[in-house]
From Swiss-Prot:
Pfam families cross-referenced by the UniProt entry: eIF-1a
InterPro entries assigned: EIF1AD, NA-bd_OB-fold, RNA-binding_domain_S1_IF1, TIF_eIF-1A
Keywords: Nucleus, RNA-binding
Subcellular location: Nucleus
Name of the featured protein: Probable RNA-binding protein EIF1AD
Stretches assigned to the S1-like domain: 14-92
Amino acid sequence: MSRATKRKHVTREVLEEHVVPAPQQRIVRVLGSPGNNLHEVETADGSRFLASMPPRFRHHVWIKRGDFLLVDPIEEGAKVKAEMALVLLRPHVRFLQRQGLWPTAFAASPDRTPQESDGDSELFVNTNRATIETDTEEEEEDGGDTESSEEEEEDREEPLEDRPEDRPEDCADVGSAAQRRSTIETGT
């Protein structure tokens, strides 16, 4: 089976509307991913274990913390006790709730609150780039007092002559730095 055909079948399976769990299957919530296509999950009764992602879902389906899964139990596993059968999307969850098959322990969880929504807090932060911190709470508390914040920013700036990167003793070519400084001071 080609890659495109496989992806088409997996997508069709994930997007099926009417999913009824078999008697041995369980609905679980994803707590995290320790790696190696394993996901730590929690059942409705609070027991935690690892669930493996079968090869058909790898590179085609993405799972994040808080998502719900339908899993098949594995008897021979000590730590890995289940294998994912299906990733439950919002339409699946709504259908299971209407049918009365949704666990009561997860009743408040399917619709995420605004604090849990898909925000930027879970995204990877590139430490090789300068980050600009924006504090919206502080701006709201000030009530539009922009004059004081502008004055604080001016006070924080270092004068050009006091900046450490401009000191001639720190430069590799001291002669050229001194020449540049004299050129700047004289304006020629």
